[in-house]
Regions:
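Nucleic-acid nuclease catalytic cores
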Residues: 70-71, 95-189
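Short intrinsically disordered terminal tails
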Residues: 1, 192-194
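Metal-dependent nuclease catalytic cores that hydrolyze phosphodiester bonds in DNA/RNA
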Residues: 1-105
């Protein structure tokens, strides 16, 4: 497999020295965020990043709870509550994956063992979007390609600002086809960009 590298500053993945699109870039046409003020969008991105980091540090046992910002705390509490109420084993966390046949990359939040099944968990701090199904399908297929092991479930975990969570199982059988359609559109636009 080609070495997968990620440049944090530019949010760019490269495989074997060639830039490959991210799952987020590929699915961008499904999420019209143009009506959201840029500063609000940036705030939401920063909040999501902080919540992801807090949950990751919590799961690795490295979190200094006194360092958690007040705005992040309810989302972390929601994750801690989910961990207590839904027993699962974490198999992988914040892992970058690359699909060599379809040439895309992404970073999944958690690969877990839940009720005897390997599942993708994608943590969310905002509203639920239809693109989350194709997003988790992309991660599922890349993980399966890399590991040779089946992933049997996909979930968007909605962490809420009141300390609660909602578990959304992604079951639409068309999610993978939607992702591949977006990938074809992404390639077409890049090929014909002026």
């Amino acid at each position: 497999m080609s070495a997968l590298l990620f440049d944090e500053a530019t949010h760019t993945y490269t495989a074997g020295g060639v830039v490959v699109p991210s799952v987020t870039q590929i699915l961008a046409p499904l999420n019209d965020l143009s009506f959201i003020k840029p500063e609000v969008l940036q705030y939401k991105r920063d909040l999501g990043t902080a919540v992801h980091k807090a949950t990751e540090l919590y799961d690795t046992g490295e979190l200094d709870e006194s360092s958690v910002a007040d705005v992040v705390r309810p989302y972390l509490d929601a994750w801690i509550r989910l961990r207590a109420e839904l027993p699962f084993e974490i198999l992988g966390m914040e892992e970058r994956v690359f699909h060599p046949a379809h040439r895309y990359a992404g970073t999944y939040d958690r690969l877990v063992q839940l009720d005897g099944k390997r599942c993708i968990f994608d943590l969310k701090t905002g509203g639920m979007f239809p693109s989350y199904g194709p997003q988790t399908a992309a991660y599922k297929n890349a993980v399966e390609k890399a590991s040779g092991k089946r992933v049997e479930g996909r979930y968007a975990i909605e962490l809420r600002d009141d300390g609660t969570y909602r578990l959304h199982e992604m079951t639409d059988p068309e999610d993978w086809q939607v992702f591949l359609g977006c990938l074809a559109l992404h390639r077409f636009k890049n090929k014909h960009a002026a």
